């Protein structure tokens, strides 16, 4: 996605991680709140937390995509990759329409980054126009941050836990991803994947992509025997 989402960092966000490709499961209220913040013209803040692989980054990528398509300037900061850049990359981000900070747990104990996030948060409050979305692997008060004022700020907004998908929802999510890629995932094949593979969604989606490519190359439909052959199960 070569859009204003790369205004601040040389990152390319995945084109297929949009709201249309996100299966909500038990997260409908969270999704509605997130989209409401994106629709409003003034600032808003949401903190999402969940274990890794639950879809936190997907939702931030989707938010960036939605506002970028409207022509708004957005910034995405993946703190799990903070060694690629310096805290000063946050300078001026309060001028953007949307700032997404992913994996904030990664800076716990890093004084420079904690202060940079704290200062950005305050500038965004003063601007009154920038939407702020932050994700972590636990609630703000449990982040073990060295800066108490930052933990307090993070606790101010709307806080949502991203609920994990049930197996039925995972099947629906896989079938949705397949349809968006232009092919069908038979129910029996989907259930076979859930039974035999790691059920973490990122792994399942990567496997689905692998099977899609193999199916195209072999010009064969997805069946359980074909899946066993490709995945060596």
From Swiss-Prot:
Keywords: DNA replication, DNA replication inhibitor
Segments forming a coiled coil: none
GO biological process: DNA replication initiation; negative regulation of DNA-templated DNA replication initiation
Pfam families xrefs: Bac_DnaA, Hda_lid
Record's subunit section: The active form seems to be an ADP-bound monomer. Forms the RIDA complex (regulatory inactivation of DnaA) of ATP-DnaA, ADP-Hda and the DNA-loaded beta sliding clamp (dnaN).
Function: Mediates the interaction of DNA replication initiator protein DnaA with DNA polymerase subunit beta sliding clamp (dnaN). Stimulates hydrolysis of ATP-DnaA to ADP-DnaA, rendering DnaA inactive for reinitiation, a process called regulatory inhibition of DnaA or RIDA.
Family: Belongs to the DnaA family. HdA subfamily.
Name assigned to this protein: DnaA regulatory inactivator Hda
Annotated organism of origin: Escherichia fergusonii (strain ATCC 35469 / DSM 13698 / CCUG 18766 / IAM 14443 / JCM 21226 / LMG 7866 / NBRC 102419 / NCTC 12128 / CDC 0568-73)
């Amino acid at each position: 996605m070569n859009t204003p989402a790369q205004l601040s960092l040389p990152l390319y966000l995945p084109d297929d991680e949009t709201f249309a490709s996100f299966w909500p499961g038990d997260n409908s209220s969270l999704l509605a709140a997130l989209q409401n913040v994106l629709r409003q013209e003034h600032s808003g803040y949401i903190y999402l937390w969940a274990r890794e692989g639950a879809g936190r980054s997907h939702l931030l990528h989707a938010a960036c995509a939605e506002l970028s398509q409207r022509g708004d300037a957005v910034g995405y900061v993946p703190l799990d990759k903070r060694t690629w850049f310096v805290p000063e990359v946050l300078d001026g981000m309060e001028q953007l329409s949307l700032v997404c900070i992913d994996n904030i747990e990664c800076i716990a104990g890093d004084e420079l980054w904690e202060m940079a996030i704290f200062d950005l948060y305050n500038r965004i409050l003063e601007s009154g126009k920038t939407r702020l979305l932050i994700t972590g692997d636990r609630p703000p008060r449990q982040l073990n941050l060295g800066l108490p004022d930052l933990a307090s700020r993070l606790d101010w907004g709307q806080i949502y836990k991203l609920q994990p998908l049930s197996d039925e929802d995972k099947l629906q999510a896989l079938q949705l991803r397949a349809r968006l890629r232009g092919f069908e995932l038979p129910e029996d094949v989907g259930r076979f994947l859930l039974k035999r593979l790691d059920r973490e969604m990122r792994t399942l989606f990567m496997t689905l992509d692998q099977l899609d490519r193999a199916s195209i190359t072999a010009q064969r439909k997805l069946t359980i025997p074909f899946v066993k052959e490709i995945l060596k199960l």
